[in-house]
């Protein structure tokens, strides 16, 4: 064994206890000197190069000369391909110089070398958020600050560059300010667009290493409404030989590597008539996520107390969903006299037991794509757990209230600080 791998006296040094957290701190210092105590100095005291930070005020504009037609209402894809708006934003980064000036330019292909880091080592992260045309005529984005903060966490987790989340938010708003008025016209209240900020490692060199070049880009696309399936969502629990995430891993980060390995099980579940996988973890079968959405149950305790229960964030098994956070906040603020909001580990056996005892009231999934979606059935090891899901599977009373409150905020029926209004004066 190499001497460096042989701790003295059988004890691990303090510097070995949390390598990932230390690496994240150093990554932040490298690309955000203004966010550190001393500009240009990392937390380990090593002098850092004077690199450029991400700066939305440097955004340049090159408008398309070939604008495309907006698809008819209800059309969201073209021969199976996503339909995107006229423009996108790109920003290059290098370890030597930091962030280049952002560019708003016509939507089109990216140029990558076959040896680009992202194509071999999954150095990729992304976010998903929506812009809404309100019934009051205004254009809004729902809580973009939360998505930008989460993208920073995802980026540094896979050794991509850091940035100030507020600058990314400004770029998102700038892109929607240009494309929003055309692609979400006032004549289509109640419609939305899907925004996808993405960062990829672009360094053209094979070898397992942190990329020294990266590209941040933001695109906007149409997406079919993923409303609650008729009768409610049906889940199939994950097989014993497969997990989506694990303690000490990266299930909490929105990285592409979390999604590809789950597609096989999801495809098989859909072939059997189910909509998503309910991902279980550990020998006790802890409930974690429903597909790529956060999972909730509403039940009564044996003492008669109604609880809204979801998995916790402290072990980093699940994604800290923006909709999840919004649901929890609204439940605590507006349902405090009716329900107790609980974030804890709970198992599929607890769900089955609550159902058998008549204590399982409702269940739903939350996320940007499915929003708040009632769950009507969970299939586990050959048996079905039937869950009350309201009339037509549209959701029970608690699910519906939470969903309707969020709809009102997103579409401007309720003025709320979560709905960020986009300027349309560009």
Positions of predicted regions on the chain:
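Feature captures the catalytic cores and cofactor-binding loops of soluble hydro-lyases/lyases
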Residues: 321-326
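Conserved alpha/beta cores of soluble small-molecule-handling proteins
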Residues: 2-276, 282-286, 329-426
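Glycine- and Gly-Pro-enriched alpha-helical subdomains that act as flexible
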Residues: 286-318
């Amino acid at each position: 064994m190499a001497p460096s791998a042989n701790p003295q006296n059988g004890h691990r040094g303090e510097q070995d206890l949390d390598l990932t957290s230390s690496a994240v701190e150093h990554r932040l210092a490298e690309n955000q000197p203004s966010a550190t105590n001393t500009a240009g100095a990392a937390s380990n005291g090593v002098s850092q190069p004077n690199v450029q930070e991400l700066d939305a005020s440097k955004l340049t504009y090159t408008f398309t000369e070939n604008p495309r037609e907006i698809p008819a209402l209800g059309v969201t894809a073209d021969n199976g391909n996503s339909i995107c708006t006229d423009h996108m934003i790109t920003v290059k980064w290098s370890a030597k110089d930091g962030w280049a000036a952002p560019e708003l330019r016509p939507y089109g292909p990216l140029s990558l070398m076959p040896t680009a880091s992202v194509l071999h080592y999954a150095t990729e992260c992304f976010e998903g958020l929506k812009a809404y045309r309100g019934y009051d005529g205004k254009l809004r984005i729902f809580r973009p600050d939360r998505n930008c903060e989460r993208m920073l966490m995802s980026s540094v987790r896979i050794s991509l560059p850091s940035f100030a989340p507020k600058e990314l938010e400004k770029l998102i708003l700038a892109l929607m300010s240009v494309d929003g008025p055309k692609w979400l016209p006032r004549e289509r209240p109640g419609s939305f667009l899907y925004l996808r900020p993405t960062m990829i490692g672009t360094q053209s060199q094979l070898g397992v290493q942190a990329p020294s070049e990266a590209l941040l880009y933001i695109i906007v696309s149409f997406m079919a409404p993923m409303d609650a399936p008729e009768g409610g969502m049906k889940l199939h629990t994950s097989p014993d030989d497969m997990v989506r995430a694990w303690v000490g891993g990266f299930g909490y980060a929105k990285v592409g590597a979390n999604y590809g390995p789950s597609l096989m099980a999801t495809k098989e579940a859909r072939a059997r008539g189910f909509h998503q996988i309910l991902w279980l973890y550990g020998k006790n079968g802890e409930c974690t996520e429903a597909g790529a959405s956060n999972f909730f149950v509403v039940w009564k305790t044996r003492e008669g107390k109604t609880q809204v229960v979801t998995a916790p964030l402290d072990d980093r098994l699940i994604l800290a969903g923006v909709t999840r956070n919004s649901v929890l906040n609204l439940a605590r603020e507006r349902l405090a006299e009716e329900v107790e909001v609980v974030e804890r580990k709970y198992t599929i056996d607890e769900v089955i037991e609550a159902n058998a005892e008549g204590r399982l009231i409702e269940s739903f999934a939350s996320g940007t794509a499915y929003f708040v979606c009632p769950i009507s059935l969970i299939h586990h090891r050959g048996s079905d757990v039937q869950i009350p899901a309201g009339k037509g599977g549209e959701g029970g009373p608690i699910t519906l209230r939470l969903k309707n409150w969020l709809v009102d905020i997103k579409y401007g029926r309720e003025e709320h600080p979560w709905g960020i209004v986009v300027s349309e004066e560009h």
